[in-house]
From Swiss-Prot:
Alphabetical list of Pfam families matching this protein: Pentaxin (PF00354)
Residues bearing attached sugar chains per UniProt: 147
Stated name of the protein: C-reactive protein
Species name: Rattus norvegicus (Rat)
SMART domains the record matches: PTX
Gene name of the record: Crp
Amino acid sequence: MEKLLWCLLITISFSQAFGHEDMSKQAFVFPGVSATAYVSLEAESKKPLEAFTVCLYAHADVSRSFSIFSYATKTSFNEILLFWTRGQGFSIAVGGPEILFSASEIPEVPTHICATWESATGIVELWLDGKPRVRKSLQKGYIVGTNASIILGQEQDSYGGGFDANQSLVGDIGDVNMWDFVLSPEQINAVYVGRVFSPNVLNWRALKYETHGDVFIKPQLWPLTDCCES
């Protein structure tokens, strides 16, 4: 009986550290500047990517630059990076090189962000609250690597680490979904209003994650929706 109870305690502890759950209407909250607060995510798909779409909500309260979404491999720490640079705007990196979408200031309200890229053309898209920015091109012919370390709240300057508090997010992140293809404009707008098209890399409704440091799970602050998954 004692051995059974010990095994049960280990199982409970493991399930709390490595969640795999429906995060609907919840958000990760990063309440302060830190080099130790972050969330690591485990991808459902382990294969190389010839295209991707990442969508999420972000609500930040910092006047400096910060990381929004960091996807590192052992050969490229900025394999995929979504980053806000103060006074410049949003940048999207693929395989190291990055491209900038100009903006004078970060929105003060929760913002829905979608970033897409495809290897065949190198076309990069950035959507903010269902509205597209001008398309740009980056890393045509590149293939995004496997065995990724995916981090929310920090930028990785090494695989799974190398964090800098001056690049940390202070605020909320939620509704994080990722696909291994480029969503159509109609699909991106549908995701913005609450529908989800079977994410096959990261799925907010069946998320594998681990929190580190002062990160909390709280109800989301952006509009609630009751749309069903397609």
